[in-house]
Amino acid sequence: IFYFEEKPLSQILEEKLHIKIYIENDTRSMAYGEYLQGVVKGEKNILFINISWGLGIGIIIDGKVYFGKSGFSGEFGHFSFFENEILCHCGKKGCLETGASGSALYRTLLERYKEGSNTILASKIDAGEYIGLSDLIDAIHKEDMLSIEILEEIGFNLGKGIAGLMNIF
């Protein structure tokens, strides 16, 4: 039987380990790491973009991580961006993440293949094997048109989203 106290996990760990504990999301942690030791070392204001299965931003203002009013700053992938019917994992439709992320790239590849597009990744798709970004890049180097088209489309959408961020930061 599990017993869960109504305490933050960081507080429970601090009591057990006797050290200060901070629990943070991946993107804000990466942004802070770049601020401390990365290519932006010495800058006071940073906008860090994490492009992965989803999209997120870490914001550093005057040398401090920005959390936002409710602690959920940086949900870049959930900007209302498209007029599509693709349901985002957040429950909304039209999020930038539905057309400009790793998950969008993968979903689009599978959809277009099932619709009849040819790709050198067909055997991996048919076998249910994992297809990563490196597989897509290899396919592009081998001039796989479907992979090229999808990366161009995702890149275009992502570029438009990033351009919008640059205008507000």
Where are these regions (language model features)?
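Short active-site-adjacent structural elements
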Residues: 32, 56-58, 166
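ATP-binding/phosphotransfer module of carbohydrate and carboxylate kinases, centering on a glycine-rich
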Residues: 11, 15-19, 37, 42, ...
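Conserved active-site and cofactor/substrate-binding residues in soluble primary-metabolism enzymes
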Residues: 4, 8, 25, 30, ...
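Glycine-rich phosphate-binding loop of actin/hexokinase-like ATP-binding domains
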Residues: 40-100
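Glycine-rich phosphate-binding loop and adjoining helix at the ATP-binding site
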Residues: 1-45
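Intrinsically disordered, low-complexity boundary segments flanking structured domains
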Residues: 35, 65-68, 123
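Alpha-helix N-cap/helix-start and coil->helix boundary motif
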Residues: 28-29, 54, 102, 106
